[in-house]
Amino acid sequence: MGYTGPQSAITPLVEGLRRLEYRGYDSAGIALGTPNTLFIEKRAGKLANLEGSLPANMPTVHSGIGHTRWATHGGPTDRNAHPHVDNEGKLAVIHNGIIENYSELKAELEKSGHTFTSETDTESVAHLLSDLRKEHKGDLTAAMRATVRRLRGSFTLLAIHADDPQTIVGVRRNSPLVAGIGDGENFLASDVAAFIDYTKRAVELGQDEVVTITPGAITIQDLDGNPLQLREYEITWDAAAAQKGGYEHFMLKEIFDQPKAIADTLIGRLSDHNQVQLDELHMTVDEMRSIKRISVIACGTAYHAGMVAKYAIEKWAKIPVDVEIASEYRYRDPIVDKDSLVIAISQSGETMDLLMAVRHAKSAGARVLAVCNTNSSTIPRESDAVLYTHAGPEIAVASTKAFLTQIVAVYLISLKLAQVRQTLTDTQVRDLYFEMLELPAKVEQILETIEPLRELTRKFVKNNTVLFLGRGIQYPVALEGALKLKELAYIHAEGFPGGELKHGPIALIEEGTAVIAILPTADEHALDEKMLSNIQEVKARGARVVVIAPEGAEVIGAEHVIRIPVTSALFQPVLATVPLQVFAYEIAVARGTDVDQPRNLAKSVTVE
C-alpha cells in the first residue's frame, strides 16, 4: 500500500493494510516519508503489533508505504518484515512475490560494499535500486526501470526516497498492483479494497509498467521510459460491501450473501427470446460449434467448481472435458490446440499457477475463457474473454459465495454451448435457466433454517477426522466440504466417491468416526441406492453418519439428516454445499481457530 497526499499518511496506510489482512500475513511495517530521512517501523505478528509500536507523538507525515508479509525467504521476524532500506536508510522498498535471482544480486552487492541485515530476497532490491538511483542522478522512476531489467521472478515493488518523499514509484510483474485516483491524493495497492474508503477511481497497470504517483498526478511508463495512457475504471462496489455488516465473521456474512450473489450472476443473462445471452464470450456460432475439447483449469475451491463444470458441459453440450489442477498443467504435455477451449476459474484473477497455465494454453493456440470475480485483474486481461461472476468482494480466505457463483457461471456457459450446438432444445435450455433462477430462493430457504444445523454441528467438535462421501456430481461437493473443514478447523478431512470406500478408505472407519454423506437426487435413482448402501457400510463399522438429503428422500441409517430443497441433479451442488460451509464454520468457531484468516493460508496465491 502506498499513499501520498494532504492527510496524515498513517491513517490511510494502516486502514489500507487492515483491509488487506484477508490476504494473509505474518508481519507488517510502514515507511513514512519524513523530510531528509525515513521513519521505519515493522513488527512480526498481527497489524495490532505494528500499531502498538508507533509513537504517540508522531509528527504529521503526508506520504508513505505499508506492507503485510507472508514469509517466503527468511522467517516471520521483525528483521525480515518489510520495508527494507538501503545502507543510508533513505530509500525503502516493499515487495510482494519472489525475486528468483536474489542470491546472485546479493553476492554482487556485498562485493561492492553493501551490508545486509535480513534473510529476505527483498533487501537485494533495496540496495540495487539505491545504486541505480545514484547512476540516474536521483531519478527514482528511471532507477526502477533499470532495476526491473535486472530482476527475475514474479513481483510487485513500491519504493520511496527521503529526498523526494511525496513521490512513490511502483511496478508489477505477474503480481497485482493497482493505482487509485483521489482528490489531491493518490494511492497504490495490491487490491482496490485498500483504498475503497477514499476513491472508486482506479487505474489498471500492466506487466512491467512503472507507475509514479505524487499528490497531484499518476504517470505510467514502459521499461524504455515511453509514457503510457492511463487505463481508468470505476470500482463497482463500495466500502460497506467489504464490512462484516453485523456478522461475527466475514465468512458468515459471505455465506448469507450467497442468495444475492447467485441472483446477481444470473441477472441479465437471458434474452427476451429465452436464450442464454453471454455476449462476453466473444465467440461466433461457428467458433462455438467447432470446439472439440474443453479443459477447465483451476486451483483449490475453484477446481471443485471445475469438476462440476465437467458434469454440466458433458451432460448438456456433449463436449469432452478435462479438469486440470493449474499448478500441474504446464509441467506435462496437455493436448490443447486451436480447437480447444480452456476455461480458467479464479476468484481473484491473480492466481499465479493459473496465470502460468493460461499463458501455456494460449501459446498452444487455444482460446481461453476466464471465469473471475475481480474486474481488471491479470487473468481476465490475458484471456480471450471473461465471464465475470458478481459475488462482490470476498474477504474471508476460505471461499464461499465466489464458489457458488463460479458454479452458476459454468452452468451458464454449459447451457450457451448446448443451445448453440443444439444438443438441447430451446425449451430445455429455457426450463433449465428458469430452474436456476430458483436457486437463490432455495439457498435462502436453507439459511433460514440454519439454527438446528448449527446445534447439530457442535456435537462433532471433538472429532479429529471427518470423511465426506459423494457420488456423481456430489463428489466435488464432498471434496469441497472436506477442504473447508481442513482450511477452517485444521481437522483431518477427506472427500471420497462413495464407490471408492471399499477400495481403501473404509479402513479409516472406526467407532465414532464422523461421516457426512451427500444423497443424490431422486432422478439419479441408481446412485441414490448405492449411496444408501455406503451409509449402511460405514454405520455397521461404528461411524456417526450425517446425511444431506433432498426433502422427501428416504434415508436409512443416519444419526442426523440435513434436508435441502429439491432440485435437478446438476443443480444440487449449489444447495448441498451450503450446509457443509456452515458445518465447517461452526466447528472452527467452537475450536477457536481464526475463521477469516486461517493459519498459513493466503486469499490470493500470487507466487508459484
Which role fits each region the language model picked out?
Residues 1-249, 260-292, 331, 444-447, ...:
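Conserved short alpha-helical segments that host acidic/polar catalytic motifs at enzyme active sites
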Residues 92-96, 255, 599:
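C-terminal interaction segments
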Residues 163-164, 173-177, 183-184, 202-246, ...:
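A SIS-like phosphosugar-recognition module
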